[in-house]
């Protein structure tokens, strides 16, 4: 199953219908941003569960895009958008991520890119020996990206991943 079809930088990058176009971002990150934004849908699922306040889109090394939304609960059983996107990816037999966008809105309702929380950073790092290379959109206005290893330096599991890679 190819959830959103093949995806490459060679695809044309058109101005979205709502007029938002961030020329500072690469066509790949622009498309990932639009996928993540399209999943943004904050709503109350029940008196104890809210969903969709953050959405995420990941691009795998094979060119597929998987998305997810956060699920916040009254207990500690919630799940971040990034981990839900990863669960969708793993469900479809993939495990290698190339790029990640976390979408949310600020207090004024403006679009913004978010950084994965500490739990998501850890989860991402444990996926693959090369996960430190995952490129993450850090700043929507400038299109600045960071590598996951910059967000979790001196990661404790590095030696285990290197040993398994041999």
Regions found by a protein language model. Name each.
Residues 50-60:
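Short beta-strand scaffold segments in enzyme catalytic cores
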Residues 26-46, 95-166:
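C-terminal binding/interaction regions
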């Amino acid at each position: 199953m190819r959830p959103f079809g093949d995806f490459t930088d060679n695809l044309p990058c058109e101005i979205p219908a709502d007029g938002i176009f961030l020329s500072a971002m690469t066509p790949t990150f622009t498309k990932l941003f639009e996928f993540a934004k399209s999943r943004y849908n904050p709503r109350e699922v029940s008196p104890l569960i809210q969903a969709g306040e953050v959405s995420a889109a990941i691009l795998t090394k094979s060119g597929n895009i998987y998305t997810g939304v956060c699920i916040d609960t009254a207990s500690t059983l919630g799940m971040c958008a990034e981990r839900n996107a990863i669960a969708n990816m793993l469900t479809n037999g993939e495990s290698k991520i190339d790029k990640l966008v976390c979408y949310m809105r600020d207090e004024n309702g403006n679009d913004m890119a978010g950084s994965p929380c500490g739990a998501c950073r850890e989860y991402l790092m444990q996926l693959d020996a090369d996960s430190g290379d995952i490129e993450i959109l850090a700043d929507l206005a400038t299109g600045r990206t960071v590598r996951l290893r910059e967000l979790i330096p001196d990661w404790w599991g590095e030696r285990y991943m290197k040993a398994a890679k041999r």
